[in-house]
Amino acid sequence: IHEGGHLDNLMTSVVFLVFKNKLIIFTKQKLKFIPELLSNMVLRDANNFMQEVLLKIMQKDFHVMLDDLRGVKEKIDDLDSKISTSGSLRPTFGDLLTLQKYMIALSTTYKANHKALDFIKKNFTTIDDIDFSTKKIIDELYDTSDTMDRIILGYSQYLDNLENMINNMISYQLNMIMKTLTEI
């Protein structure tokens, strides 16, 4: 999570185009794993090149997103311990807002990936000769996608509760200050 990062910079779009049996991949930022993945890839069936590449990239992409979620968990834990030790300070509130912004970006990305997965499943299942391993990969991707959706929902709810707690702490502190000033 970049300090002061803009929402647009938190996501990387990947566009796949198929033109005359060639797969063209466009990204805003260079994704290091794509060339490495393609150079080490062994095709099961040359006739299903596009399908295999798309599924392989989606698998790797989902793995990267799960790692990102682990990083978010660490950031949430850090924020939680900051609140416990120092109270609701301005930097803590800024960190909370940054995390919430990042959660929005992740949620949007996951929804887009789920739609892409729906498209892939719809188009692959119309192919009569789809093999068992391809179906298995698609099912695993759906399971991973559902898991990420549940995790992101849980983290978002937790951050919302943290925000409420911070607001309550600030309100309490202001009330105590006003009470002290009134007594003076």
Model-predicted regions and their roles:
Residues 78, 88-184:
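Membrane-associated alpha-helical segments
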Residues 1-94, 108-114, 118:
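Extended alpha-helical interaction modules
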